[in-house]
Curated annotation (Swiss-Prot):
Function recorded in the entry: Probable neurotoxin.
Protein name as it appears in the record: Conotoxin Cal6.36
Organism encoding this protein: Californiconus californicus (California cone)
Keywords: Disulfide bond, Knottin, Neurotoxin, Secreted, Signal, Toxin
A Gene Ontology molecular function term of the record: toxin activity
Main localisation: secreted
Subcellular location: Secreted
């Protein structure tokens, strides 16, 4: 039971991590949905800096 929880958590962290750090122009990135005219690079930092 405990192993399943840990695995689920790991998958969640990886998925969110990929979305956050993905290229802004990538449809899978978090920023793509928040702000379609996103610059390339670290979407999360860009969004935080620009208040998106």
């Amino acid at each position: 039971m405990k192993v399943t929880c840990v695995l689920t958590l790991a998958v969640l962290i990886l998925t969110v991590g990929q979305m956050v750090t993905a290229d802004c122009r990538s449809p899978g990135s978090w920023c793509f949905y928040k702000h379609s005219n996103c610059c390339s690079g670290n979407c999360f930092l860009w969004c935080v800096q620009n208040g998106k």
